[in-house]
Amino acid sequence: METRDLVIIGGGSAGMAAAISAFDNGVKDILILEKGEFLGGILNQCIHNGFGLHEFNEELTGPEFLTRFVNQIEQRRIEYKLNTYVLSLSQDKTISYVNRVDGMATIKAKSIIVATGCLERSAGAIEIPGERPSGVITAGQAQLYLNEYGYLVGKKVFILGSGDIGLIMARRMTLEGAKVLGVAELMPYSNGLNRNIQQCLKDFDIPLYLSHTVSKIIGKDKLEAIEVSEVDSSLKVIEGTARRFEVDTLLLSIGLIPNNALLNAIGAPQSKTRGSCVNEHMETSFDGLFACGNVLHVHDLVDYVVEEARVAGLGASKYLKGELIRGEHKILTEAGEGIGYVVPSQIDLDEAEDFIELKFRVKRPSKDVYIVYSCDGKIIKKV
């Protein structure tokens, strides 16, 4: 069986950044396994700008951003396999994969970084009443069809959910000649970045219906119309508030979830993000097995994905060199009131640097509040 020092599952921005970080910290035997036809992952279909402001101090499109990392991969001669689907991994770091060149194959790794990204929630996740006609599609899939294959999925469009992909597709569909009748958001606030609300909706006079949801899908074979209703504070549909929209396409932007199936299958403890629990090195509960990027928790900016992936790459290099200290003094992080989750889930005080970055997401927008860090009931910091 072939053995490699480091195998990275996923060749998107997280996988490439982790590989570059590990290489630059002394790991030369690296293999990236990527299921797609090209490196770069989701960035291949993100032809809009807004990437790289933190990483390069420039505003780049998705393909421009990923090309800079692909160039670094090529310069370092880091090996990668494309069109390669990983079937499973085991606790002893054995990976089974399949592709057209190798067929079904198995490889042993001394260390693994999982960077498999995230998935879109589909219509089945929210159980909208009505038929199941064609024309109901996730926003990311519509983006793929339009930006990579040149297919406009509809002419009269409504979007459910105000996530960033949905907002960006509202603008993209408008620019390509479709009529976007509106965006409905279940919550009383948008889940997208403020800049996307301004640039993608307000600049194009696309209405945003807060505290609304699609309450019915109409059409048997093809989508004919939808009903949009208000919801109350319990997120239940308010009877008598339905408005009918004649559309041929409903785009769903109803959330992303980590694509964590490989780690779940081997029993890696799961955090509130639906990703795996990790320490400050992005190492899971299994020694030498790391996770980073959207498979860990969904990021707003790819620049933040890259930062996190570098930590995982450095952690893997330390593990391979025997430099990771297994101390006895560990503390767990826990999300308090108003906070959805915290990453990392665990910090090793014997190994911790002077500065540890905690990443978290609030449950809802709030004003005039403090962020309080406490330990054993004592306030450490208040900002």
Predicted region positions:
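Predominantly flavin-linked oxidoreductase catalytic cores and closely associated redox partners
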Residues: 104-105, 114-208, 213-222, 288-291, ...
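A Rossmann-like FAD-binding core segment of flavoenzymes
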Residues: 68-97, 107, 174-261, 354-383
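Beta1-alpha1 glycine-rich phosphate/pyrophosphate-binding loop at the start
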Residues: 4-68, 144, 153-199, 272, ...
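FAD-site-proximal beta/loop scaffold in flavoenzymes
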Residues: 136-146, 249-299
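A conserved FAD-binding loop/helix module that cradles the flavin
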Residues: 292-337
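Short amphipathic alpha-helical segments
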Residues: 19-21, 44-45, 125-128, 170-172, ...
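FAD-binding core/adjacent interface of flavoenzyme oxidoreductases
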Residues: 1-9, 67-156, 232-240, 251, ...
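Rossmann-like nucleotide/phosphate-binding core characteristic of flavoprotein oxidoreductases
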Residues: 1-5, 60, 82, 271, ...
